[in-house]
Amino acid sequence: MFNLKLNFMSYDFKYADLLDDDVFKLVFGRESTKDVMIEFLNQVIPDRKIVDLEFIDKEMHPVERDAKGVVYDMFCKTDSGARIIVEVQRRKQPFYPERAIYYSTFQIQRQVEAGADTYDFLPVYVINILNFKMDGNKDRADVKSVYRLYEETTQRLLTDRVTFIFIELPKFKKSIDELDGNVLEGMYFCFKNMAVLEECPKVLTHQIFRKIFEVSELYNMDQDTRDKVIHKMTTERDLRNQMAYARQEAIEEGRAEGRAKGLAEGRAEARRELCMSMLEKGLSRETV
């Protein structure tokens, strides 16, 4: 029987949460784990075969002095020159799609040199791994959504140079018993459940998962990194439990208010029925 811990009050983690910024960088953002990132990107962008990539400085300064700069979670350039930005977002933020668009502009600007005769640039991808459902996209069942620039009526593609990909993890509902060896779905499962797993599920047979689990294991990290990650994981777990408790309290209070309101409405209805009965029997309104 596969062992999946569901007691979120327990802090005896074996594996780190892949949605943690530091852990994501450890697993996907180093030269020693570059093959993990390449496999992930090839799964997410199947129409672009990536053979190699280069990790680049994540901090982007604006062209204008007073404009807002950004720091990407992960930024790399593929062997064909495509720029890929990867963002991991645990909590919902307002204007998140607009943020993704803003992030893409830095890589467009930096490819078009001042004074250039053309505005040609190599493809830019912004991949967003989200631990929430986006507003306006909640009715869509697919975990992965791909957005490009299209003509509204004909749906003709304007350009393939800018692509936005959103992975909404709450939409991935499969249990371990429902996985069939699909690599991308296996990665979705790990993103959602790594922190509560005690072993690598046997269905995850691709060699890449062996490395993901090895690097994510807390006792394979140095002491400082392990302490930092565990502290963040316990804080996140405490916050999640507090939010769950607050929601439960609100539900209970709502039920209590509903019961009280129902009793009051019931009494009022009973009084109305009694008054109508008395009037029907000929009693005056003054008496009633």
Tell me the role of every PLM-derived stretch.
Residues I50, H61-V63, Y103, G186-M187, ...:
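Generic hydrophobic, helix-prone segments enriched in Leu/Val/Ile
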